[in-house]
Each structure stands twice: as structure tokens, then as C-alpha cells.
């Protein structure tokens, strides 16, 4: 059965446990960075960073709020990145029937028009390595979930912000949580729930969290 995530940003504390767990499980190196006077680190996705907690300070109702957004690939129902890559090589990006995972393979390095693949993503997720055209992003921890384990990011979350299971279960959980918080947050919404397998809940306008929070 198709899988999915429910990401409840109202429960995210920006501990970045998900970000660290993702790197540890995939054996990816830390990103060289510098102190910019802001807490978000690294500043953006890269070839070795598939999960990133974005942090934005916003003035809401006359007070400063810190908004956290644990960003990742949405594993779209109809992934435009794959549709674009398929024009060159239908095996460069795989859409797994069993899980719904959108998986970038090493064959992406042979795609000449990699820029079109990247720009096709409405969430600005894929990144390429400097040495070639090979691209990478969240792989849904497909090696874990096909062996009965949850994704690394989900197992590390201490607050219940990250959730994973059958897509129908995640959709129901997201809808129930939205109804629960609507009284306190009138602008709360689910981000593109009909188009993605990673459903984000935001308490405020999604664009306050990240420019590409919604398509």
C-alpha cells in the first residue's frame, strides 16, 4: 500500500533530530558552513542534505513568532521531476508502485538536461553534486520501510511532528489534527494534500514558513 508522511509543524521544536538522523542513516557528510548569526544550518538543501529544518521569524498578530518547517521531498502523486527525466531516460527516476517513493538513481548523472528536472519540482527540492549531473533528495528511507522500519527522520522525532504510515492513515491523521487546531489557528491548513505523499500542516500561511512550502 502507498505510504506517506504527516508533518505537523505545530509540534516541531526545531531540535533537528530528523535532519541529523537522515544524514546518519544515509552516511552523508556534514555540510561545511559558517556562523551567520542565524540558527538554520545548513542554509539550504544540497547533494548530501535531504532533510532540512527551515526557520523563519515572522511578525504575526503583533508579535514575533518563530516558524519551523522540517522540509523534504513531497514524493508527489504525479511527480513532475520524473515526467521531465523520462524524456531522456525512464529509469533515471523511479516511481515505486508499492510505496509511492520517488527515487533518484545514479543514472541521473547521465541526464543532459538536469536543470529542467530540478526546475520541474514546485518545491525546489532536488540538488546536484558538483562533479557531475547526478542529483539526490529524500528517498523515503525505502531500504528501511521495505524491511518493516520507519524512516530515520520519523524515529528520531520526540514530539510527534514527524509521522509515517499508509497514505490513507496519514491523510486521516492530518485532517483530524487540522480540525483540532482550527479554533486556535484560523489560518491553519494542509499543504497540497491531494498532490503529495508528504502532507504538511501549518498554523499560518505556508508561505510564511518557506517560499516553496506549497506549489
Curated annotation (Swiss-Prot):
Keyword Metal-binding included in the entry's annotation: yes
GO cellular component: periplasmic space
Domain of life, per lineage: Bacteria
MF terms (GO), sorted A to Z: 4 iron, 4 sulfur cluster binding; metal ion binding
Residue sites binding [4Fe-4S] cluster 3 per the record: 73, 76, 81, 121
Cofactor section: [4Fe-4S] cluster
TM ranges: none
SUPFAM superfamilies: 4Fe-4S ferredoxins
Residues bound to [4Fe-4S] cluster 2: 22, 138, 141, 153
Protein location: Periplasm
A Pfam family of this chain: Fer4_11
Cofactor binding remark: Binds 3 [4Fe-4S] clusters.
Main location (coarse class): periplasm
Residues where [4Fe-4S] cluster 1 binds: 12, 15, 18, 157
Record bears the keyword Cell cycle: no
4Fe-4S ferredoxin-type domain boundaries: 3-32, 129-168
Keywords (A to Z) from UniProt: 4Fe-4S, Electron transport, Iron, Iron-sulfur, Metal-binding, Periplasm, Repeat, Transport
Gene3D superfamilies from the UniProt entry: 3.30.70.20
Quaternary organization: Heterodimer of alpha (FdhA) and beta (FdhB) subunits.
Record function comment: Beta chain of the formate dehydrogenase (FDH) catalyzes the reversible two-electron oxidation of formate to carbon dioxide. FDH loses activity in the presence of air, but this activity can be restored. This chain is an electron transfer unit.
Protein name: Formate dehydrogenase subunit beta
Amino acid at each position: 500500500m502507498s505510504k506517506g508522511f504527516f508533518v505537523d509543524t505545530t509540534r516541531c521544536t526545531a531540535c533537528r533530530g530528523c535532519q541529523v538522523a537522515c544524514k546518519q542513516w544515509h552516511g552523508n557528510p556534514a555540510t561545511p558552513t559558517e556562523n551567520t548569526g542565524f540558527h538554520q544550518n545548513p542554509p539550504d538543501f544540497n547533494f548530501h542534505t535531504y532533510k532540512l529544518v527551515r526557520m523563519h521569524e515572522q511578525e504575526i498578530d503583533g508579535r514575533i513568532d518563530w516558524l519551523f518547517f522540517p522540509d523534504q521531498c513531497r514524493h508527489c502523486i504525479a511527480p513532475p521531476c520524473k515526467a521531465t527525466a523520462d524524456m531522456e531516460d525512464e529509469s533515471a527516476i523511479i516511481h515505486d508502485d508499492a510505496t509511492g517513493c520517488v527515487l533518484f538513481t545514479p543514472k541521473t548523472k547521465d541526464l543532459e538536461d538536469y536543470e529542467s528536472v530540478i526546475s520541474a519540482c514546485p518545491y525546489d527540492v532536488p540538488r546536484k553534486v558538483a562533479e557531475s549531473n547526478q542529483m539526490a533528495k529524500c528517498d523515503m528511507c525505502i531500504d528501511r520501510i521495505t524491511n518493516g522500519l520507519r524512516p530515520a527522520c520519523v524515529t528520531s522525532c520526540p514530539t510527534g511532528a514527524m509521522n509515517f504510515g499508509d497514505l490513507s492513515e496519514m491523510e486521516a491523521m492530518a485532517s483530524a489534527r487540522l480540525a483540532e487546531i482550527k479554533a486556535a489557528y484560523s489560518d491553519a491548513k494542509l499543504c497540497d494534500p491531494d498532490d503529495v505523499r508528504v502532507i504538511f500542516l501549518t498554523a499560518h500561511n505556508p508561505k510564511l514558513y518557506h517560499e516553496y512550502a506549497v506549489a
